Amino acid sequence: MAKMHSSGKGRSGSVKPYATAFPTWLTKSVDEIKSDVIQMGNKGVPAPDIGTRLRDEYGIGKASDVLGESITRFLQRNGVVPKIPHDLESLVHRANTLRSHLNIYRKDNSAKYRLILVSSRMYRVARYYKRKMRIPGNWKPKLVELNK
């Protein structure tokens, strides 16, 4: 699949595990792992970080083999949903980082251009989540003020 703001194809460097069988090397039971995932979600840990912890600490390469579904869907089904989805939150954070950089380095044209690209992607994702009712219809990102 092509990237949004470049001519590259965006091939991923990682490969999903081929086998979809249940991992036999787990030391914890499935219920303990599920309760740990719910606890991490309650603490505010984003779903990608939960997946990284499952991979590094428990040896689970693919969370859907143990949980039966994706981490995000599992958390939604158990009532642990973040107010703002992780991808939108990271885009807002990236836009704020660029804006604070531009407050210091006002003539950085490359950063200005990247801010335009990140902002357009952020508003596009926000429109999608408003349509899907994941965020309120009047949601606006909390952005850093740009000095003139």
Curated annotation (Swiss-Prot):
One GO cellular-component annotation of the UniProt record comes to: cytosolic small ribosomal subunit
UniProt cross-references to SMART domains, sorted A to Z: Ribosomal_S13_N
- The source's domain of life comes to Eukaryota
Please give one Gene Ontology molecular function term for this protein: structural constituent of ribosome
Matching entries from Pfam families are given as: Ribosomal_S13_N (PF08069), Ribosomal_S15 (PF00312)
Gene Ontology biological process terms in this record: translation
Keywords from the named record: Ribonucleoprotein, Ribosomal protein
Task: Report if keyword Cell wall biogenesis/degradation is assigned.
Answer: no
Tell me if Ribonucleoprotein is a UniProt keyword of this record: yes
Which SUPFAM superfamilies does its entry note?
S15/NS1 RNA-binding domain
Q: Which family does it belong to?
A: Belongs to the universal ribosomal protein uS15 family.
- Family matches, as PANTHER family: RIBOSOMAL PROTEIN S15P/S13E, SMALL RIBOSOMAL SUBUNIT PROTEIN US15
**Protein's UniProt name:** Small ribosomal subunit protein uS15
Q: What is the lineage of its organism?
A: Eukaryota, Fungi, Fungi incertae sedis, Microsporidia, Unikaryonidae
